[in-house]
Amino acid sequence: MKSGFVVRSTISSWESAERFCRQFSLPLLDMQAKHNQEVFQLIFDHQNVHLLDCRAKKPLTLMVDFVTGSRDHRRKFGGGAGQAVAKAVGVKGNRTLHVLDATAGLGGDAFVLACLGSRVTMIERSPVAYALLADGLKRGLLQAEEAGDDELLAILQRMTLVPNDGSDWMRDQLASSDSEQPDVVYLDPMFPEKSKKALAKKEMQIFQEVVGGDEDADKLFEPAFALAKYRVVVKRPKIAPLLNGQEPSVQLVGKSSRFDVYAKKKLPE
């Protein structure tokens, strides 16, 4: 079950916050306004957009950062094409793929694929996830440009974010006569965990509390398989049931998660 949140903004970020709230039909409060003490606050300020968990004495903050921290470390030392997600998608050598990530979340796997040369179109329906990811991309592009980091700049330029429901967006593409067919459709729907212990990182606990599990995830499979040119890849917790009950062509099983690969035809060399 999803928890409620409020959107708050400083004066310096009011215009972008107001634009976001209009897009998703959400109310906007300034930083001094009283509210109903919602546990979570989505904050727009001059530095970034972040999600604030107000329950602890020291509030916990969740934001997207492609420039420093764990994502920067993974970009530099993550194992390249040997990573499980890369193997499942089919990243290999100089092969350049267009990947549709129909459940982008906070963009972690999309970033890995973009680091390995793929062009990634990300679809995200949650207003909170979209706001955090869009801000992370915007800041990342600015910081990479300012630092003269051409490699990171090129990576982030290969990532495109669209606010929409993944299933609806794919069906619209199938109905369109001039849409581009992605080589691979990647699905990582939020699996409703029954305990917080199943979510190792505190940040992911917060994220799932606000976004909620994708209870309707099964509806993603049919349009994904119809739209993908070569394969559909589904990331699931290791013990989770198959998406839509569909048997995969092959499975890559890790310690806590697995990748179910549904092949349509062989990827080009």
UniProtKB/Swiss-Prot annotation:
A Pfam family reported for this protein in Swiss-Prot or TrEMBL: SAM_MT
Q: Which residues bind S-adenosyl-L-methionine?
A: 124-125, 188
| Keyword terms, alphabetized | Cytoplasm, Methyltransferase, rRNA processing, S-adenosyl-L-methionine, Transferase
Could you state a single Gene Ontology molecular function term? rRNA (guanine-N2-)-methyltransferase activity
Q: What is one term from the GO cellular component aspect held by the record?
A: cytoplasm
Q: Where in the cell is it found?
A: Cytoplasm
Please state the span of the N-terminal signal peptide per the UniProt entry. Answer: none
Highest taxon listed in the record's lineage: Bacteria
Annotated coiled-coil positions are none
Q: Which InterPro entries match?
A: 16SrRNA_methylTrfase_J, SAM-dependent_MTases_sf
- What SUPFAM superfamilies does this protein's entry cite? S-adenosyl-L-methionine-dependent methyltransferases (SSF53335)
Per the UniProt record, which EC number(s) apply here?
A: 2.1.1.242
Q: Where are the transmembrane segments?
A: none
Q: Which reaction does it catalyse?
A: guanosine(1516) in 16S rRNA + S-adenosyl-L-methionine = N(2)-methylguanosine(1516) in 16S rRNA + S-adenosyl-L-homocysteine + H(+)
Q: Which PANTHER family match?
A: RIBOSOMAL RNA SMALL SUBUNIT METHYLTRANSFERASE J
Q: Which family does it belong to?
A: Belongs to the methyltransferase superfamily. RsmJ family.
What this protein is reported to do is described as: Specifically methylates the guanosine in position 1516 of 16S rRNA.
Protein name (record): Ribosomal RNA small subunit methyltransferase J
The record lists the organism as Saccharophagus degradans (strain 2-40 / ATCC 43961 / DSM 17024)
Gene name as annotated: rsmJ
